[in-house]
């Protein structure tokens, strides 16, 4: 009973999200006269462990974006791999680093290592950093939509609409798919409409160069490093935005 009471406020998010979608559709029908956004430079960060079977599909979906491809650089960290993840990623055109470290294990350590190597080799040339898991696939306009919001200057951290890649496979994948829907539509979308901060959930998010420099790369190493990152930024006064138009698929 206590659990239900604590989480009952989330019931408010459902009508807020539904009403918000209706308002957004009406605005799209009217059209917008806003000027085109600035075209910013992005680094895509992918930390992968034994993902040779799927990583090529993600890289291909990045290369097929409607956003100018010369402004997007894809970096892969083959982390403690025992398969051909590095070779597969290179074969699809990514810049690949490799790490073997059985003491500092986990995505948080991998992201920190990858950002440090990028800083050594490329300096601070990227305006924003996009984070994905190796089994993701992006809609063709994903980066274009994220850039529209990011270039507006209101948000330095933006999360996006995570959809299911394999909803119909079994009851477990269906459960994950429904959870993705709940996070996107009933939580982050509603929170953004109410003017409160959204949350980052593992993959499909963007953070600015200033945020990277402020925290010193990536310093979150808990098992749920995404929630650690979210909590740290919100308590520091940073509001996290949600871009519903930027859709990607996850397993």
Listing of model-derived features with the role each one plays in the protein:
Residues 1-38, 89:
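N-terminal membrane-anchoring/stem segments of glycan-assembly enzymes
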Residues 40-43, 73, 228:
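Cell-envelope/extracellular polymer assembly enzymes that use nucleotide-activated donors
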Residues 56, 83-90, 98, 141:
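Acidic helix N-cap motif at the loop->helix transition within catalytic regions
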Residues 60-71:
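Short, acidic, metal-binding catalytic loop of nucleotide-sugar glycosyltransferases
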Residues 98-100, 104-123, 140-223, 234:
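Long helical/loop segments within the catalytic core of UDP-sugar-dependent glycosyltransferases
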Residues 122-137:
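Short beta-strand-to-loop acidic/aromatic patch adjacent to the donor-nucleotide binding site
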Residues 195, 221, 230-249:
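Catalytic donor-sugar/metal-binding loop of nucleotide-sugar-dependent glycosyltransferases
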């Amino acid at each position: 009973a206590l659990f239900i009471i604590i989480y009952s406020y989330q019931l408010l998010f459902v009508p807020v999200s539904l009403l918000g979608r209706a308002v957004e559709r009406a605005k799209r029908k009217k059209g917008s006269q806003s000027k085109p956004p600035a075209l910013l430079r992005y680094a895509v960060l992918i930390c992968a462990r034994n993902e040779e079977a799927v990583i090529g599909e993600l890289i291909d979906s990045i290369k097929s974006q409607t956003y100018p491809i010369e402004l997007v650089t894809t970096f892969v960290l083959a982390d403690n791999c025992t398969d051909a993840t590095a070779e597969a990623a290179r074969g699809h055109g990514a810049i690949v680093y490799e790490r073997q470290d059985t003491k500092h294990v986990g995505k948080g350590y991998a992201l920190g290592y990858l950002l440090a190597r990028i800083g050594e080799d490329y300096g601070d040339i990227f305006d924003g950093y996009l984070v994905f898991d190796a089994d993701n696939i992006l809609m063709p306009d994903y980066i274009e939509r994220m850039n529209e919001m990011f270039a507006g200057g209101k948000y330095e951290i933006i999360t996006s609409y995570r959809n299911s890649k394999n909803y119909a496979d079994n009851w477990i994948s269906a459960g994950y798919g429904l959870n993705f829907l709940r996070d996107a539509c009933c939580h982050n979308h509603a929170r953004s409409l109410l003017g409160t901060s959204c949350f980052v959930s593992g993959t499909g998010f963007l953070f600015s160069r200033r945020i990277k420099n402020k925290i010193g790369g990536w310093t979150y190493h808990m098992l749920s490093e995404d929630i650690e990152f979210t909590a740290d930024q919100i308590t520091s006064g940073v509001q996290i935005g949600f871009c519903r138009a930027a859709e990607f698929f996850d397993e």
